Each structure stands twice: as structure tokens, then as C-alpha cells.
């Protein structure tokens, strides 16, 4: 059974949010309006399930009363009892403690590691995999910065991935387990003897704060450098000093952005990425003992720390954390990630329940 106090709190909060959203003055503060709208969307599945449960309970009560006078109604009772049980469990699951960042957008970084050009090409494959998955979900993807290798791979790249609408389960809820070392086994394009090589690329992922102002950043802690954006030539290349590099001196975190049209826009996007990284760092430092609460992420790209292997000769993908295997590597790299991400989410929920 659901704890009455838990759902009562949700009902009261939902009513309060409805009142705020109906107030025209709320939209005088766009930041507050986004925050209220996002929370309202997060509560929507809970409210929908609660209303279905209340309706099913009323139907069950009525069926039992009718069955007392007319035995022909008794046949309906078991099915209604089953519906009530299922909805009670669904509501309990929705009310269970969850990652507070699940509704957030993300900043995702891919970095090449061991393997030279082959590693950079694989890093680009990973970036495309996430982009294609995002396209399937209708999310917006922006490449904030990229260092391209001689063969067109990514030595490193930073992506911003945003959902188009506020939702209980946002980008972070799907991608939060992707941080770590990804290993590839295949014949590189640079291999003339047809031998299979093993190389690695790393993924780092951070929930993005709704507003940079949510993270305290002292301007005196920043070194901001501007330089000319790099490119391959042609009309689209920005020939002014519009690229921005921000160094956060206390932590040594460096963020660059060069894909926007102006220095001001690049600085704003770089500050968003910096805020996401500082938020993640602060949470990691505050929760060192709670590693099970979120996926541990790489700090060095080392094949020995792999979370997943992509085996091209066998068309197989293996996630070593949960023992997941499938032979549809080509589809996965084309963005067909749901089965894998669902399995990771299920394993995480089971681990959380076992720890309680």
C-alpha cells in the first residue's frame, strides 16, 4: 500500500503548482516559469496513476456491494482487485526515491584514448550513436566543441543534449549510465594486415543545471581566453577571435566552445558546460561513499576500466557491469539503445531496492 502522507504531499504540491501556472505574473520570471513547469511535468505520471487507482478502487467497492445482492456481479471482483493491486504497485514505484537529476538535460563528452587514430574514429562513432538515439527521441543535439583527428575522428568532443519538453524522465535518466571507458575490437581502417585491434574511448556525462546561476561560480576564479575558431575552410568558418576557453582555476577544469557565431554566445555556452561540471564535481565530493547511487565515471581513459565492449567481428555488444550481451552492434551504433538502457535502468532499480 502507498503511504498516505506521501501521496497527500504530492497532491498538495500539484495543486500549488496548478495555482502558480494559472497566475499570469509567473511568466514575468522565465526562470521560475520553467522551474514550475518542469516540476508540474514530473508529477504528471504520478497524478495520472493516482486518478486511475482511485477510479479502480471506486469500481471495486461498487462491484463488491452489487455482488452482495446479485451473485452475477461477483465475477467482476477478481479482475478489479488485480487492477487495484497493479495500480497500487505502479504508484508505489513512482513515489519511490529517485535520482533528482532524472529530468535534466546533459552535457556529454567523448574522448579518444589508447589506439591513436582508431580510438578517435571510435570516439566519433560513439558520438554519432548518442546523436542518433537523441534524434529518435526528438531531443536537440548541439556540438559545442570538437577536436577532429586527421581521419575525421574525434580526439575529443562536447555535446549538449536537451529534451524539447519538460518530463519526469529526461535525457539524464537515459544516459546517466554511459559514463566510463568503452572498448572496441575491430580491424582499423589503418590496418593493412587485416588484424583485429583493441582500443578505447571515454565518455563523461553531466546533468546540466537549468540555470548557470544555480551553481555558484566566482568570476575571480576564472581565466577566460579568446582565440580564432578552427575549421576546414569555406564560407562557414568564423575568422574572428570568437572561440572561448574558460579555465576554472581552483579545480583546473577547462571548457572550450567555438561553434556559436559570436564570442558572447560561445562564452554563455561554455559557462553552461562549466556549471554542469562543477555541479557534478561538488556532488561527487559530497557523496564519495555513495558510489552506488550513480555510475562511476572515468578520469583516465584506460582499457582496463572498461564498462562496455563493442566487438565488430561478432557484431556483439557486452556491458560488463550487468552482463548484458546482444548481437546487434550495428543497430546499437545506429542509435537503437533502448534495450540496453532499459536493462541498465532495471539493474540500478533492483540494486537500490536490495540496498534499502
Swiss-Prot record:
Subcellular location: Cytoplasm
Post-translational modification: Methylated by PrmC. Methylation increases the termination efficiency of RF1.
Record key words, sorted: Cytoplasm, Methylation, Protein biosynthesis
GO-annotated cellular components: cytoplasm
Superkingdom per UniProt: Bacteria
PANTHER family: LD18447P
HAMAP family named among the record's database cross-references: Rel_fac_1
Protein name: Peptide chain release factor 1
Organism classification: Bacteria, Bacillati, Actinomycetota, Actinomycetes, Mycobacteriales
Amino acid at each position: 500500500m502507498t503511504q498516505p502522507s506521501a501521496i497527500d504531499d504530492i497532491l498538495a504540491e500539484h495543486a500549488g503548482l496548478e495555482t502558480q501556472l494559472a497566475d499570469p505574473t509567473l511568466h514575468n520570471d522565465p526562470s521560475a516559469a520553467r522551474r514550475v513547469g518542469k516540476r508540474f511535468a514530473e508529477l504528471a505520471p504520478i497524478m495520472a496513476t493516482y486518478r486511475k487507482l482511485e477510479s479502480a478502487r471506486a469500481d471495486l467497492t461498487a462491484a463488491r456491494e452489487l455482488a452482495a445482492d446479485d451473485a452475477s456481479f461477483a465475477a467482476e471482483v477478481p479482475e478489479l482487485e488485480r487492477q487495484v493491486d497493479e495500480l497500487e504497485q505502479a504508484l508505489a514505484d513512482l513515489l519511490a526515491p529517485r535520482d533528482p537529476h532524472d529530468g535534466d538535460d546533459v552535457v556529454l563528452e567523448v574522448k579518444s584514448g589508447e589506439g591513436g587514430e582508431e580510438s578517435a574514429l571510435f570516439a566519433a562513432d560513439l558520438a554519432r550513436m548518442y546523436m542518433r538515439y537523441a534524434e529518435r527521441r526528438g531531443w536537440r543535439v548541439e556540438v559545442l566543441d570538437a577536436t577532429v583527428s586527421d581521419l575525421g575522428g574525434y580526439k575529443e568532443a562536447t555535446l549538449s543534449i536537451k529534451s524539447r519538453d519538460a518530463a519526469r524522465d529526461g535525457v539524464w535518466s537515459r544516459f546517466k549510465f554511459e559514463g566510463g571507458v568503452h572498448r572496441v575490437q575491430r580491424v582499423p581502417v589503418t590496418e593493412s594486415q587485416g588484424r583485429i585491434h583493441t582500443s578505447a574511448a571515454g565518455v563523461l556525462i553531466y546533468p546540466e543545471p537549468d540555470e548557470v546561476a544555480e551553481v555558484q561560480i566566482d568570476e575571480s576564479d576564472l581565466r577566460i581566453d579568446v582565440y580564432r575558431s578552427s575549421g576546414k575552410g569555406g564560407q562557414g568558418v568564423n575568422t574572428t577571435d570568437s572561440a572561448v576557453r574558460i579555465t576554472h582555476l581552483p579545480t583546473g577544469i577547462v571548457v572550450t566552445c567555438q561553434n556559436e557565431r559570436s564570442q558572447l554566445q560561445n562564452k554563455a555556452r561554455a559557462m553552461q558546460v562549466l556549471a554542469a561540471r562543477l555541479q557534478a564535481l561538488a556532488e561527487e565530493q559530497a557523496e564519495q561513499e555513495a558510489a552506488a547511487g550513480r555510475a562511476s565515471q572515468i578520469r583516465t581513459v584506460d582499457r582496463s576500466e572498461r564498462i562496455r565492449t563493442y566487438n565488430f567481428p561478432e557484431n556483439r555488444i557486452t556491458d560488463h557491469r550487468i552482463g548484458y550481451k546482444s548481437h546487434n552492434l550495428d543497430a546499437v551504433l545506429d542509435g537503437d539503445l533502448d534495450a540496453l538502457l532499459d536493462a541498465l535502468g532495471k539493474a540500478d532499480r533492483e540494486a537500490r531496492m536490495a540496498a534499502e
